[in-house]
Structures are given as C-alpha cells and as structure tokens.
UniProtKB/Swiss-Prot annotation:
Top EC class of this enzyme: isomerase
Family annotation (InterPro entries): Dimeric_a/b-barrel, L-rhamnose_mutarotase, Rham/fucose_mutarotase
Family in the record: Belongs to the rhamnose mutarotase family.
Source organism of this protein record: Burkholderia orbicola (strain MC0-3)
Protein's GO biological process: rhamnose catabolic process
Name assigned to this protein: L-rhamnose mutarotase
GO molecular function, one term: L-rhamnose mutarotase activity
Signal sequence annotation: none
Gene: rhaM
Subcellular location: Cytoplasm
Length: 104
C-alpha cells in the first residue's frame, strides 16, 4: 500500500457546507472510491489558508485515474464546484504533496 497526499483549495466561508456535503457522501461515490482502491481517506482543512489537505492509501494496482471517467465522480465534482477551486474540466485543482517525514 502507498500513502499519497495532495492539496486543494476551498473558497472562503464554504467550510461548513463542504463538511455537510461530505458528511452525507453519496453511497455510490463511496463505493466507487473503494472500488478504485482508495482506503483510509482523510481530508483536513487549514482555516488560515483555506487549503484542504487530503491523505489516502492505495494499492499498487489502484484504478484512481479511471474514476474521472465515471458518471458519479463527474456529478460529485459538479456538485462541489461552487465550494472550491476547479479546473476547466470541473475537477478540483490538486497539488501533489511530497512526503517529508514518516514515523511508524
């Protein structure tokens, strides 16, 4: 299993709605994430910068790239687009983060 992290940006004042929507994550989206190999998925917020920091685990044979092709992922991105920075294709703008330290 590999652990990866990435950063996204939430629009100011949208944290309560972001949390509300994720608290009610669609079951079919959760199923699609798991089917792609995603596990132990966390998203943290830095209130000062409005950055969201996501951390997840994935196996070597993950299918995360294929998620973008699914209807449920595209619908979720459209649903979340008013809350966060997105690219022209509607997906959240993500910046991969480099691991700097790990303690088991």
């Amino acid at each position: 299993m590999e652990t990866i992290a990435f950063r996204m940006r939430l629009h100011p004042g949208k944290q309560d709605e972001y949390r509300r929507r994720h608290d009610a994550i669609w079951p079919e989206l959760a199923d699609a994430l798991r089917a792609a190999g995603i596990s132990d998925y966390w998203i943290f917020l830095d209130d000062d910068t409005h950055h969201l920091f996501a951390v997840l685990r994935r196996p070597a044979d993950h299918r995360i790239a294929q998620l973008a092709e699914t209807d449920v992922m595209r619908r979720w991105w459209a649903y979340m687009a008013d809350l966060m920075a997105t690219g022209p294709d509607g997906r959240p703008v993500e910046k991969a983060l480099e691991p700097m330290f790990h303690l088991e």
